[in-house]
């Protein structure tokens, strides 16, 4: 099993190094969806688990009520909906099968279960983890690595996994050269654009949104300036 990780500086490189071992003969575009899909799965599972434990602690029996997750509010009182993750798709259910030859199929089924419970995600999540070309032993090692992140000691899992997601995107961009412009604009450029726009309120529209970096940076801008995220609407196409 992978060693415990502190998620300090260099954590993103460790994620990339471990994930890159899975590549084998998989096409670059499909490999990208595997790596980023796994990060997304861990993120929504962690966020669901935090809300789940909060509801359990309240002791009113609403921890399996989907509406409680859709109506979730953050500590600032703003709506912060949480995707409902069914039991078979929660990270703990996946982690116990990390060293099983069926780990790819288990992850694919988890993605399907999440799509079924969250119509907004229908036909969006990657479901190619069971393909023969993907090294299941390496996949299990990456699952272990994610499992062993001590989130409670190193801040919000959203920040940690967000860093990993952005770092992996940049590495894919490096590997794909000029073609990467189809899905990725360097974060420093997007951040500069957002600082010029100062999106405190109104609409943020990106006609070539790719991986959604403009929207992420806009949300971070509002948070950094103590604004209200509910004062903006984001629109994008690609």
Q: What is the role of each PLM region?
A:
Residues 1-200:
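Non-catalytic, mostly N-terminal accessory regions of nucleic-acid modification and defense proteins
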Residues 179-238:
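Conserved S-adenosyl-L-methionine
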């Amino acid at each position: 099993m992978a060693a415990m990780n502190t998620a300090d500086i260099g954590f993103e490189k460790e994620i990339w190094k471990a994930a890159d071992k899975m590549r084998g003969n998989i096409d670059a575009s499909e490999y990208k969806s595997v790596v980023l899909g796994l990060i997304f799965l861990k993120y929504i599972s962690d966020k669901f688990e935090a809300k789940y434990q909060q509801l359990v602690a309240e002791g009113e029996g609403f921890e399996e009520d989907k509406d409680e997750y859709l109506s979730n509010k953050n500590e600032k009182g703003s709506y912060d909906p949480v995707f409902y993750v069914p039991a078979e798709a929660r990270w703990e259910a996946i982690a116990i099968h990390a060293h099983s030859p069926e780990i790819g199929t288990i992850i694919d089924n988890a993605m399907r279960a999440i799509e079924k419970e969250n119509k907004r995600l229908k036909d969006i999540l990657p479901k190619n983890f069971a393909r023969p070309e993907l090294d299941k032993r390496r996949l299990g090692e990456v699952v272990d690595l994610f499992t062993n992140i001590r989130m409670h000691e190193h801040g919000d899992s959203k920040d940690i996994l967000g860093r990993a997601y952005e770092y992996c995107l940049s590495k894919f961009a490096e590997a794909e050269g000029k073609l990467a412009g189809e899905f990725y604009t360097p974060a420093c450029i997007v951040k500069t654009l957002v600082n010029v726009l100062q999106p405190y309120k109104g609409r943020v529209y990106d006609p070539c949104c790719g991986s959604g970096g403009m929207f992420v940076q806009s949300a971070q801008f509002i948070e950094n300036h103590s604004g209200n995220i509910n004062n903006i609407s984001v629109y994008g196409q690609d």
